[in-house]
Amino acid sequence: MKILLILVIIVFTNNFFAQKTFSSKSVLGHELGTEFSTHAQVVDYFEELNRVFPNNSKLEIYGESNEGRTLQLIFIGSENTIKNLEQIRNNHINTSVNENIPIVWLSYNVHGNESSGTEAAMETALILLRDKKEWLDDLLIIIDPCLNPDGRDRYVNFFKQYSTVSKNSNVRSLEHQEPWPGGRFNHYLFDLNRDWAWLTQVESQQRIKKYNQWMPHVHVDVHEQGINENYYFPPAAEPYHEIITDWQRKFQEYIGENHAKYFDANNWLYFSKEIFDLLYPSYGDTYPMYNGAIGMTYEQAGSGRAGTSVVTANGDTLTLSDRVEHHVAASLSTVEVAYLHKKELISEFQNFNNDFSYTYQSYVLSGDSYKLNALRRLLAHHDIQVREPKAGSVVKAWSYSSQEKTNYKIKQNDIIVFVDQLKGPMVKVLFEPQTFLSDSLTYDITAWSLPYAFGLNAFACVTELPFKGELPEPNEFSITPIPNDSKDAFAYVCKWNSMESARFLERLLSTNVKVKYAKKSFQLDGNLYEPGTLVIARGENSELNIDSLIIQASKGLELQMNTCSTGYVEKGNDFGSSSYHEIQSPKIGLLAGEGHSPLNTGEIWHYLEQRLKTPFLMSRPNDILDFGLSNLDVLMVPEGRLSAELVDEIMTWVKSGGRLVLFGESVENFFDELSIELTDQTDEFYEMSEREELSEMITGAIFNCKIEKKHVLSFGYDTYYTLRQSASRYTLNAGKAVFELPKNSKAISGFVGSNVIEDQEGALIVGQEQYGKGSVTYFIDNPLFRGFWSNGLLMVANAIYFVND
């Protein structure tokens, strides 16, 4: 007994001593707030923190970034809370169970070069564990110290390489001038704070899985802004989405009042109720809001120009230590407010997820199975349930395409997305035909309705619909779409109607299979095949084991493919006709570097590497000038500015047969050489107020397009809705406008300024023109925007494989 008592005393004494003497410097090699910590050091820090405070913390690795860096959470609470994490989680998710532990989730550094956030996360965790035990008795705090470790290390490594020993505070010093692309973005140059809902990036996918397992009551997204700005905290600016409750608004006022108390005591300046609104659903504040939490953004002066110290416009010196201190104060104040309102947080969260008094109760989605399955996979990531309807029943509904009420007869394979579920509010936000704007002055796009983004027919119903049952998440396909007698087949024909078709084509070309596409529609064995259909003839691949290669190329893909016993078609041109064009495997280049939009560059990069899975060459502008373009067939140019010398080099290459693909305003580099022109330009804004500017703007509105269906760029499209983010109107004097806005064009959804509503008729969306032996494709509205406009992906493949074939 005496020995046991001695052991208990020793363990207690050692734990007490360790907690009192925990040293950040001993782990990091520097005091917090004096230097930037690398991500490896951050991982070590939290491992040591968990070792020193084992009873009040649990460390969990939830994934890794594109570049293999650890994504982790630390759970902080009382000893009893940490022992019973799974029970607490189950009690919370099952809202019928009486729960008493609110969950506060603090997220830091979603933008890599806003790098004081992770330093603040380390300090906040230490203070909570060491000094705030009374809060831990009644709260569970989850900290994600770095949502974007690849971007953060990109910035931290730059700063360590170029900062002087004395840490020059002059903003013109090299250490304050990040090189392209900067640390804000992740590996693929995506803005992870715009990806919460769309989940195009692996970091987002892994984080959202963990988030939805916990569904916190409070979520804070910690950011930085320009070096001359004062600290921002809620309440947020209008517009608020209409589903945000009075309680969610009120809690933001509690937060603002409590933060102000601490900031006032330290004479720190701040602002609220401006700039940062609560509308676009893919932010780190709105996504939690639409899932019942109190979602908030905090913004500290800093970012990539700040370094560890910088002289601001008013002559003050902003230090890393200042930035960390402000974030720590706001973080701890958040936990305190949650502690003071813990009962309300629990009850109001439950109320939010039990109130579905929305206009539309069900959404019927109809379309090709691959589009429906792509949508279902996204919804499954968000834990949104989908139902199988009763085919043949007729429902009264609002039609997304006709923009009017109609009677719709439900088809086989249609799906129902319904609001009477835990994620019902999120369903409303993602599917509503039009988003209500309480204020048109907003921080981001104003339209995103998923049926338009995925190219699906949709019908919104005011009632809950009868159904057969719940539909599970679609499995990855493992299709072998080849009959047993395929070895006697004359050819294989595959419809061109999705990115699955494009990936299938790319796989075939990589194994030297000869593939042709149909320039015109044809009918065979009673099946109608539209232009773009792929034809793989056995006779043209006689030296290959074509059956085996097709089986391999089709694995994991959902394709509409058949075999045929003859090349003699029932309607249209026979397979030996010159109307079937052979597809060559293209050598693709992507222009990247200084002067180009990192975001648009990343969208194209991600598309080529992750969507299409094709090899390509990424080159800086100077490399093009040094080595030329003769080894490329296709050059993709993201938004940005080019030198006159580079424009000449590119146009010489196009004239000799190159295929140029231009995105957005990159077309303006070629006004002197090509027929495209800017016919209506937004007025200069410098003499206008912020609200006056709105009359000249389009802030992410959805329009229906007129399509030239005989052109190769339209292969695979019957309809297309574009997401316009600019009021500038481009037109082509030669070539072909393949997708354009029709007469009397009005926005289907989203905000359009009063002075530009009438100016959109005939606006070019996607077009193409010949230049010498080559061609130029224009994507004025970016079909790869943030990777979420799913129905835009195929037209980029059309530009790569079919244009100027």
Language model segments and positions:
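Short, conserved secondary-structure transition motifs
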Residues: 141-155, 696-701
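Aromatic- and acidic-residue-enriched segments that line the glycan-binding/catalytic groove
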Residues: 153-170
